[in-house]
Amino acid sequence: MEVILKFGILGFGAIFGYLFGEVDLLVKVLVCFIVADYISGLLASGYLGELSSKMGFKGIAKKIAILILVAIAHQIDLILGTHNTTRDAVIFFYLANELISILENFVRMGMKVPEVLKNLILIFDAKSGEDEEKHDKDMD
């Protein structure tokens, strides 16, 4: 049984590496942001008495969609020979998106959000090639 588990983990790692490329810091941080956003969404919904399994499923579907888009971006980089340029831009875009959502979840619970975290959204947007100004008003 232990051998089967080890081969399963090895197979998962190989597939993950093929789909997403090197599991570098950007990929790890994206996964952390995705998990943090989902958990903060659950906390905010629970805090407000709005927990719903349907909404939870939609949240998981969106997180899987993010990972699919990152995998597609990596495959495009392989075709173009651009060494993760597209993948990294997509990751930075979703880092900004996830951070916005995390901060909005805390605001929903009545918490104040540090300016330094709001400013990171602009940095992530710049690194993704996106220019988004609408996020400031959502967190005041």
From Swiss-Prot:
Membrane topology, from the record: Multi-pass membrane protein
Entry GO CC: plasma membrane
Presence of the UniProt keyword Transmembrane in the record: yes
Major subcellular site: membrane
Keywords: Cell membrane, Membrane, Transmembrane, Transmembrane helix
Pfam families: Phage_holin_4_1
Transmembrane segments: 4-21, 26-48
Keyword Transferase in record: no
UniProt-annotated location(s): Cell membrane
NCBIfam families documented for this protein: holin_tox_secr
Family: Belongs to the bacteriophage holin family. Cp-1 holin subfamily.
Stated name of the protein: Uncharacterized protein Lmo0128
Species this protein is from: Listeria monocytogenes serovar 1/2a (strain ATCC BAA-679 / EGD-e)
